[in-house]
Structures are given as C-alpha cells and as structure tokens.
Amino acid sequence: MDTFNLLLQGFGTALSLTNLLWALFGCALGTAVGVLPGIGPATTVAMLLPITAKVDITASMIFFAGIYYGAMYGGSTTSILLNTPGETASMVTAMEGNKMAKSGRAGQALATAAIGSFVAGTIGTVVVTLFAPVVAEYAVKLGPPEYFLLMVLAFTTVSAVLGKSTVRGLAALFIGLAVGLIGMDQISGQPRYTGGKAEFLDGIEIVLVAVGLFAVAEVLHAVLFEGKIVETQNRLTRVHMDKRDWRRSIPAWLRGTAIGAPFGCIPAGGTEIPTFLSYATEKKLAKGEDRAEFGHQGAIEGVAGPEAANNATVTTALIPLLTLGIPTSNTTAILLGAFQNYGIQPGPQLFTTSAALVWALVASLYIGNIMLLVLNLPMVGLWVKLLRIPKPQLYAGILIFATVGAYGMRQSSFDLFLLYVIGAIGVVMRRFDFPTAPVVVGMILGPLAEAQLRNAMSIGEGKWSVFVERPVSIFLIVVIVTVLLLPRILRWRAARRAA
C-alpha cells in the first residue's frame, strides 16, 4: 500500500505542467534520436548534461528518461523502413521488419513495433514499481564490504558485457579508474596525479568526459571513418493491423516481455541477447504459413517479439541503476553521471533520501509510454523525414551543442581543450573496438569504491578476511568470478563442439 501511495504522489509531481512538457520534449527528442542512425540516447544525454545543469533535477531526470526509452521506440522506424537500425537493439527488428516493408506491409510492421513497445514498456514499469523498493530495502542492509564488492561487480559486468573483448573492456575501465583518481585525495586532502596543474585539483568533470567520449568522438569517428549510408526506397503504408496481425502479435508481445524483463534486472543484461532470444523463440514456435514468412516476406512475430523484449529490458534496467547504482548499458552509465551531476548517488538510500524524485521518475515512465504511443503511430511519416537532414549539418550541430555545453560549465578554455583531447581519445578507442562506457563507469564508481574499500578495511582492522565473513559477500564474489569466467567457458565449449 505504501508503494501505491508513493506512486500516486509521484504522479502528482510528474503530471505538473512543467514536468509534462519536459517528458513530452524528452520523448519527442528520444524518438528523433532513435530514428537517426549512429547518434543514440547515450550521446544525446551526454551532450545535454551541461546544458540542463540549471534545470530542476526532477524535470531533468524525467527529460533524460524520455530520451532513454523514446530512442528505443524510434530505433524500430529506420530498421523497418530503411534496414538501418538507429539503435543496436533494433538490429533484430530489421531482419523481418524490412522484409515486411519491402513486401508492402510497412504499416503493419510499424504498428506492431509501436504497440508492442507500449505493452512491454508498461509491464516493465509495473515490474520496476513492484520490485525496485524491495531490492532497495534489502540492499540498504549491506555494509562497506558488500558495497565494495557490488562496485567490483559493476566494473566486471560493464567491462565484460559492453565490449567485444573482456580485456579491452577492462583496459577501458582502468582508464576510467585512473582518471577518477585525479584531484584531491578524499582522506588526506593531498593532490593526486595533477601534474602541478591547478585545473586538475577538483578532478576532471564527469560531464566533460561523457560529452567527449560519446558526442565528440561519435561525430569525429563518423566523419573520419564511416561511409555514406545507402538508403533503400520503401513506401510507407498506412499504420494499421488487421485481426490476423493482432492474433499473431499479442502472444509475441507477451513472450518478448517475459524474455526481456529479467535481462534488464541483472547486471550482465543488455538488449542484444533478449532480442535475439525472442526472435529465435518466435521462429521456433511459428507453424505453417506463418513460419514460411520468416526470412522471405517478413513475419510479424519477428518484429513484435524482439521489440517487446527490447523495451522490457530497457525499462527494467532502471532497477539495478536506481537500487544498486549499477549501470547495465551505455545510456544507464550516462544516467548515473546525470544523477551525480546533481549531487545524488543512486543506490539503496535513494528510495529514502530522494523518494519524491524516484517516484516522479517511475510515474513519468507510465506517462511517457502513452506519449510515445501517440507520437509514434500517427507521426511516423514526420520521423522518417528526419533522415533527410544532411550529415554535415547534423554533425556540426552536435559539435556546437557539445562545445557550448562544455564551456558553459566553468567558462574555461582549458575545459574546451580537454573536451577535444578526450574526443580524440574516444575516436582511437572506437577505431580499435575499445568500449567507452567502462571509462565513465570507472570514473564515477572508482572514488566511491575506494571509499568503501577503506571503510571495509577499517572495520576488518586491516584484514582482507572481512570480505568473506558474510554470506552476501561470498555470494557476490562467486557472481564476480562467474561473470569473468563464464564467457570463456562458453567459448571453449563452443570450440570443442565445432571441433
């Protein structure tokens, strides 16, 4: 009952005119970002962090949340019409969605994607509403050893999952940890790794690193290395579904949601695995004529299931972010930085210290899902027109936003220099397949992990055995080892079978 009352209070905040406008703006911008290939919600949120620094925190987080799940809706549009996924999570949608478009059923594909996203997003939000407070209630009982191990778990999962190589992921993480050490020592107050530069005494701004690695690096990499995308010509039919489409889509939506929701809750989740699993499930369950459409005319289940799985995963990913402070994707890593930009640390205490903010954010998820359904079904033609924006103008606009935002934080020319140095490093990282999200996670969680490690060692009087004295600590150590070793074991088994 307490949860219901808190949610009602959250609706009271989220339904204010100001917050509704921010939610609408975020959903519209998120959809546009999802439609435009190569930009993504992580880049957009990173770019807007400095610009929204003076905005009320509740309005700002509702705005960022709108961008976050709005991009998932928009990503399906280009996947279906142009075979160009706006988001990596929409890759599976393109497999059947584009074939449907080429066979004259673009309208049905877009409709099942939008409605499926709404169904999965709403169910996912219910899961967040019911389970996030429970996770927070248990997590608040953890001590410094458990908190330190949770952060190590965040380091290992982000490094292992967000890159093609665990080694590259760990290398990126250690870069972030090293950058996070720059500035004043939290205990002694002595400067560390500043190189005698006064500008480094307060450390390097997280926002600066996020904007440099995501926005600036994205643009520079696209300009330097990416070729022109060849667009396919698919006519946009009326967005609707007949009775047969509904009959085939509804079970696929529910199955996709059931597959995607758990993946969002676990630190090693991600959207790629559940969307592929959903596609494989739908293809396996299809029979007769429905099965024959897979890979040929395009099967509607192959769009409905993966889109539902995608949006369920994206929504429930807020559970580990809000309750444990663990990001499971590039965008949630940037959202973690957004909270810190306002001096708030996501974790078990968030539901007590910032309850009004959390429940307004959860309420905005329900509101945003309805907004996105309205935005995506009737206005799909408008979103497709965004693809006509010339790439040079689009990239120039992103760089201008990033530069103005970075300079506006401290009016420092040194920050601008640092922004483009970080951007250049980001280009090199992308070129050699080093993931950038672990850098941001290392920067944010590194100092916090250091503080918890010192507290744990103080409690244990300098003995490392403090980390194996409680069942939760032992369980977390087992999970960390599993996350590091499981991918190698699976690859080894696959290699043996192939041999």
For every predicted segment, state its role.
Residues M1-S60, P133, E137-V140, P191-A299, ...:
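Helix-loop-helix hairpins and the membrane-proximal interhelical loops
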Residues Y68-S79, G86, G298-L324, T328, ...:
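A structural-propensity feature for long, helix-poor, extended segments
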Residues T31, M47-P50, F64-M72, A113-F118, ...:
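Transmembrane helix-bundle signature of multi-pass membrane transporters/permeases
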Residues V33-A42, I80-M91, I123-V127, F263-I273, ...:
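Short helix-coil transition sites and intra-membrane helix breaks within transmembrane domains
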Residues T58-I62, K99-G116, G288-V303, N330-A333, ...:
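Membrane-interface alpha-helices at helix entry/exit sites of multi-pass transporters
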